[in-house]
């Protein structure tokens, strides 16, 4: 008798996507991050749902409702810190996932890559709106500064900002709509993830060598499901350790002060996972130029497939490109550090140098070094 998982209309979709899915036999642990993102996303939706049951999106009570969740709700502190640190874990996995795609040339699957960029923008917008909800000092001033960037858009900028605020400043209307929009995008992200996987399964997975692996495929289950479960355990252990031992390590102390429009924090900054983009924004003295650089720092990923000049797909056998890739990683770490520092010497010049290097490496140096490697292959 034919197995039900291969004949049932619903089960056969799951079967072809996760169980009998052919996968290259050489996938390394860098291919674990897609499934880890799925687990992180599940944790975020569950904890977010329970937090939404107790949270109130009103400027008078928002801060107190978060305090109430931590003090009075059964395991509310656990929900709150799982959600906050789960976002950090989500972005760690996300950046490693994108980095893997850049290193091994997965961006040549352009549909999957472009949906991934859309996902990145959607997740970043969701996380930003979530940061506003506790209504602490950094929430309020972060929302004010970041939304104000839209005023750099010619003609419609100021009207657009006031439309988003729902008034002439960040206030009750802003908080209410940010809560609504923080709750909605995760479901849009879920749909985009399905499209992302649909396009991925059309082409099949890339592998570390970058060479077509059609003659050498294995079943995803049990081989890669076991490997994924190990990844889940490692990541959930790291998340549990962070939540239980040092829940405020990645947060900002200013967010434990209730929002006050009359007092500005000494240094306004977003969450740590946006600091690299924030540093690029601040490194340009012109407002519109800074906003364009901020958007381009992420959107530049969309033109990476066009800039691929190498005859080889993966960087596995391209030592010169590898050096540039790790230089890019170092630049991103530098930008993240600079984004958290005050705007003063020597941080300004370091940030500007790192920002120039970031765009220089992706737009010019990587394509040029690929052409050099192509030339060396002829020898």
From Swiss-Prot:
GO terms for biological process: mitochondrial electron transport, ubiquinol to cytochrome c. Heme b b566 binds at residues 97, 196. Pfam families: Cytochrom_B_C, Cytochrome_B. It comes from Artibeus jamaicensis. It is a multi-pass membrane protein. Belongs to the cytochrome b family. The cytochrome bc1 complex contains 11 subunits: 3 respiratory subunits (MT-CYB, CYC1 and UQCRFS1), 2 core proteins (UQCRC1 and UQCRC2) and 6 low-molecular weight proteins (UQCRH/QCR6, UQCRB/QCR7, UQCRQ/QCR8, UQCR10/QCR9, UQCR11/QCR10 and a cleavage product of UQCRFS1). This cytochrome bc1 complex then forms a dimer. Binds 2 heme b groups non-covalently. Its cofactor is heme b. Component of the ubiquinol-cytochrome c reductase complex (complex III or cytochrome b-c1 complex) that is part of the mitochondrial respiratory chain. The b-c1 complex mediates electron transfer from ubiquinol to cytochrome c. Contributes to the generation of a proton gradient across the mitochondrial membrane that is then used for ATP synthesis. The chain crosses the membrane at residues 33-53, 77-98, 113-133, 178-198, 226-246, 288-308, 320-340, 347-367. This is Cytochrome b. PANTHER family: CYTOCHROME B. It is found in: Mitochondrion inner membrane.
């Amino acid at each position: 008798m034919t197995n039900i998982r291969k004949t049932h209309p619903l089960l056969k979709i799951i079967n072809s996507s996760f169980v009998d899915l052919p996968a290259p036999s050489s996938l390394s642990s860098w291919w674990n991050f897609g499934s880890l993102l799925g687990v992180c996303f599940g944790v975020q939706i569950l904890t977010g749902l329970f937090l939404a049951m107790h949270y109130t999106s009103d400027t008078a009570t928002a801060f107190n409702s978060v305090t109430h969740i931590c003090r009075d709700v059964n395991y509310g502190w656990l929900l709150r810190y799982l959600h906050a640190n789960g976002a950090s874990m989500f972005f760690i996995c996300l950046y490693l996932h994108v980095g893997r795609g850049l290193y091994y040339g997965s961006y040549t699957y352009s549909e999957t890559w472009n949906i991934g960029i859309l996902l990145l923008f959607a997740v970043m917008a969701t996380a930003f709106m979530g940061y506003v909800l506790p209504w602490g000092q950094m929430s309020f001033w972060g929302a004010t500064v970041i939304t104000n960037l839209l005023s750099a858009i010619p003609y419609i900028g100021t009207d657009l900002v006031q439309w988003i605020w729902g008034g002439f400043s960040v206030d009750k209307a802003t908080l209410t709509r940010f809560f609504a929009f923080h709750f909605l995008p995760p479901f849009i992200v879920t749909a985009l993830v399905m499209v992302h996987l649909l396009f991925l399964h059309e082409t099949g997975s890339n592998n570390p060598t970058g060479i077509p692996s059609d003659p050498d495929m294995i079943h995803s289950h049990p081989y890669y499901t076991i490997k994924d479960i190990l990844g889940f355990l490692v990541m959930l252990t790291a998340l549990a350790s962070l939540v239980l031992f040092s829940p405020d390590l990645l947060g900002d102390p200013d967010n434990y002060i209730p929002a006050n429009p009359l007092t500005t924090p000494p240094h306004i900054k977003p969450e740590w996972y946006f600091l690299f983009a924030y540093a690029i924004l601040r490194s340009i003295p012109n407002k519109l130029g800074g906003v364009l650089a901020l958007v381009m720092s992420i959107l530049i990923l969309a033109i990476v497939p066009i800039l691929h000049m190498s005859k080889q797909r993966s960087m596995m056998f391209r030592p010169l490109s590898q050096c540039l890739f790790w230089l890019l990683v170092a630049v991103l770490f530098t930008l993240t550090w600079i984004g958290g520092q005050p705007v003063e010497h020597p941080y300004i010049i370091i940030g500007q140098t790192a920002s120039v290097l970031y765009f220089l490496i992706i737009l010019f140096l990587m394509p040029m070094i690929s052409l050099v490697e192509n030339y060396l292959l002829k020898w």
